[in-house]
Amino acid sequence: LMLERSHLSDIVCRELHLDCPPCDLTDWNEMLARIAARRRSVNIAIVGKYTKLHDAYLSVMESLYHAGYETGAVVHIKWVEAEEVNPYTADDILRECDGILVPGGFGDRGIEGMVHAAHYARTQGKPYFGICLGMQIAVIEYARSMLGYADANSSEFDPVGAHSVI
């Protein structure tokens, strides 16, 4: 919008000898108005393996922010290293969060912490959003807690396990 106020599109079109219609920035202006009008806050925990490098989850962050623009909420992200979540720490770490998101990842590091986060979300009635690995984690947690398969896992993490639910 600042570039358009400086007539950049007119300059570019003129220099390139293009016949350009006037810019319609209605959608942009409406989005900015929605962003400015947000009145509530939502706290989302992202429980992952790469939380020290936020750019690893850039698309997840941007998706949450844009969802907030559309719903009138300022989204605050709490970065949670999966390996720090266990039955003793889950409440302290996740209590203030309005929702828990477990994104994708590879390898078995942090898997048990993610399972504890999914368990906390389910038992405390917190919204849980599992993306890729995060959805697999939800299935593993449910199989362990609700179906009684204490050793439920993914064949990716336990290739010879008796209860490979993924």
Where do the model's predicted regions map?
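N-terminal beta1-alpha1 cap of cysteine-dependent amidohydrolase-like domains
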Residues: 1-166
